[in-house]
């Protein structure tokens, strides 16, 4: 018989930097999960990702306190900020532009994000990422 899922925990942890301090420790501790076991497994799986990149993770906690986790791709906003070379998006995106991204950069980000997007094809994924870029106050060229 399959194990019963007790809880889902959604966190955003930097790649290769999971440790028992907040936010990881308290979130897992309240469900009785072995925190160090998660940290070691997460850090091992994120070795191939650029250190410091935020990685969304969904942890499924079972009734016997065991767990599994699924990693997602880094947020589009993080990838867009890195591509545009900026620290943060605009506070007034419609009037104040803070950077530029071109179609090639959007395609690269869309390729990275494709597993997590609901887009049917690459062009739809690029348009989705372009919308995120505009909402952050970036000028989008070539879309």
From Swiss-Prot:
Matches recorded under InterPro entries: Ribosomal_uL11 (IPR000911), Ribosomal_uL11_bac-typ (IPR006519), Ribosomal_uL11_C (IPR020783), Ribosomal_uL11_C_sf (IPR036769), Ribosomal_uL11_N (IPR020784), Ribosomal_uL11_N_sf (IPR036796)
RNA-binding recorded as keyword: yes
Record note on modification: One or more lysine residues are methylated.
CDD domains: Ribosomal_L11
Keywords: Methylation, Ribonucleoprotein, Ribosomal protein, RNA-binding, rRNA-binding
Gene3D superfamilies in the record: Ribosomal protein L11, C-terminal domain, Ribosomal protein L11/L12, N-terminal domain
Assembly behavior: Part of the ribosomal stalk of the 50S ribosomal subunit. Interacts with L10 and the large rRNA to form the base of the stalk. L10 forms an elongated spine to which L12 dimers bind in a sequential fashion forming a multimeric L10(L12)X complex.
Name the record gives this protein: Large ribosomal subunit protein uL11
Organism: Teredinibacter turnerae (strain ATCC 39867 / T7901)
Gene designation: rplK
């Amino acid at each position: 018989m399959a194990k019963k899922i007790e809880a889902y925990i959604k966190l955003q942890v930097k790649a290769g930097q999971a440790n028992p301090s907040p936010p990881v420790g308290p979130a897992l501790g309240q469900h009785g999960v072995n925190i160090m076991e998660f940290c070691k497994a997460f850090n091992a799986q994120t070795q191939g990702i650029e250190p410091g990149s935020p990685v969304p993770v969904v942890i499924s906690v079972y009734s016997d306190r065991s767990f599994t986790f699924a990693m997602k791709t880094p947020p589009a906003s993080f990838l867009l900020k890195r591509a545009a070379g900026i620290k943060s998006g605009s506070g007034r995106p419609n009037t104040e532009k803070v950077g530029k991204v071109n179609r090639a950069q959007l395609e690269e980000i869309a390729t990275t994000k494709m597993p997590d997007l609901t887009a049917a094809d690459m062009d739809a994924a690029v348009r989705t990422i372009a919308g995120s870029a505009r909402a952050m106050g970036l000028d989008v060229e070539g879309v």
